[in-house]
Design a protein with these regions (language model features):
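N- or domain-start disorder-to-order transition segments that initiate the globular core
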Residues: 1-27
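M16 family metallopeptidases and their MPP-like homologs
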Residues: 16-18, 24-37, 43-45, 63-118, ...
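Short, surface-exposed helix-loop/turn micro-motifs enriched in polar/charged residues
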Residues: 40, 61, 128-131, 135, ...
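Active-site His/Glu-centered metal-binding helix of metallohydrolases
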Residues: 48, 52
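Catalytic Zn2+-binding segment of zinc metalloproteases
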Residues: 53-58
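Acidic/histidine-enriched alpha-helical segments
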Residues: 66, 122-147
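Contiguous, non-catalytic segments that form substrate-binding/exosite surfaces or channel walls
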Residues: 151
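Active-site glycine-rich loop that binds ribose-phosphate moieties when present
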Residues: 183-187
């Protein structure tokens, strides 16, 4: 059964809940849908989910963040980028055990919701209002390494090139994470 549990039309936010006794885990995710306009914009957006999932204002370093996730029975945070047609989808998600398996009636799902809210609305910024430089550079390097790995995986690379050629000059032809050149120029 799916219920709309939160809706804010002013910012286009809608939250749904789908409960089932079939699974032992809970997953909360936020999907930010952005138009694909240029490879540079795609590259800039592609860095955001992973760097946002590293630290927040509430959990300013990886150790504090990891400790909180461990307290929630080994919960985890996931980030990613995908593309559907002319849209780039930035995904941030938190997963953990279902509440019925927590000791003492602890509300793990509420804690996961707080963590996800913190990632989406209060990511860690430096005094200039930018992502911390070291974390940003690490995620930029990681994104470049992912593109290199795709090149070495021939089926993925062939699909990517086919899409680029079929949709050349159109938003759907822009790679979901931008191009190597665009990723290198992101600041």
């Amino acid at each position: 059964m799916t219920n709309t549990i939160l809706e804010r039309k002013d910012c286009g936010l809608r939250a749904f809940a789908c409960e089932t006794p079939q699974f032992k885990t809970a997953r909360l995710s936020a999907h930010l849908v952005l138009p694909l306009t240029t490879p540079e914009a795609a590259a800039a957006h592609a860095v955001v989910p992973n760097i946002s999932a590293r630290a927040t204002r509430e959990y300013p370093d990886y150790t504090a963040f990891g400790k909180r996730l461990a307290e929630l029975y080994g919960a985890s945070v996931h980030a990613g980028v995908s593309r559907i047609g002319d849209s780039q989808i930035l995904t941030l998600a938190a997963s953990g055990i279902a509440n019925r398996y927590a000791f003492g009636g602890e509300d793990v799902q509420a804690a996961l919701a707080e963590i996800l809210e913190s990632i989406v609305f209060t990511p860690l910024f430096d005094e200039n209002g930018l992502f911390p430089e070291d974390g940003f550079r690490q995620e930029q390097r990681q994104l470049l390494e992912t593109l290199d790995a795709e090149f070495n995986e021939k089926r993925i690379y062939a699909k990517r090139r086919c899409t680029e050629l079929m949709f050349a000059g159109e938003p759907a032809g822009i790679p979901q994470s931008g191009t190597r050149e665009a990723i290198r120029t992101v600041t």
